[in-house]
């Protein structure tokens, strides 16, 4: 059997932004501790923004101002620093942070901390959003599928997961789409970078 070594660990303080390389992580029921405790809300569409729908977010990186303590989590979110594509850094407490995010995205945005798990207000989908999100064309776009490709097989998801996905943009208590932890091999990352684009 070939030995496997961990090459890098990354934590992503803000959903859909670049993250921070860290020396160690703690895995809990939500995934990596203090991962994706912030998200950007698309105010015009009343939904949590994703990199698929607002790719400009990927041009930013985020890090915590200080290392999150063990109590960090839903409803107890530490300050975050965001580095914008022009190199300007803004803190989550800066009064103009939302203006900068809105300018970057080209529409009204708001940086939002993860609320308590019982508060589903930032997760709940409206009917029009639900219908739009699960239209075959939207699913194909989200998963990078061509019109001629088969749609994904949803039988891999439990009934509870499907019900959660049908009601919420992200599961309550987290800003992850579905999988709280991703394990990638260096070979997989290298194959994604064949054109010279770097991935973290």
Please give the residue ranges for each predicted region:
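Electropositive, beta-rich accessory/interaction domains or terminal extensions
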Residues: 1-199
């Amino acid at each position: 059997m070939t030995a496997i070594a961990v090459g890098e660990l990354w934590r992503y303080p803000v959903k859909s932004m670049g993250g921070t390389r860290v020396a160690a992580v703690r895995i809990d029921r939500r995934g990596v501790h203090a991962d994706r405790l912030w998200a950007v809300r698309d105010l015009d569409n009343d939904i949590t923004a994703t990199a698929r729908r607002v790719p400009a977010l990927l041009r930013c990186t985020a890090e915590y101002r200080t290392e999150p303590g063990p109590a960090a989590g839903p409803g107890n979110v530490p300050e975050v620093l965001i580095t914008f594509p022009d190199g300007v850094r803004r803190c989550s407490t800066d009064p103009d942070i939302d203006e900068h995010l809105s300018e970057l995205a080209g529409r009204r945005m708001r940086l939002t901390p993860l609320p308590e798990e019982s508060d589903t207000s930032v997760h709940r989908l409206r009917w029009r959003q639900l219908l739009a999100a699960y239209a075959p064309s939207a699913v194909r776009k989200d998963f990078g599928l061509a019109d001629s490709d088969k749609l994904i097989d949803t039988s891999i998801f439990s009934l509870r997961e499907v019900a959660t996905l049908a009601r919420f943009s992200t599961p309550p208590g987290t800003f992850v789409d579905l999988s709280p932890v991703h394990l990638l091999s260096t070979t997989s990352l290298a194959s994604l970078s064949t054109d010279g684009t770097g991935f973290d």
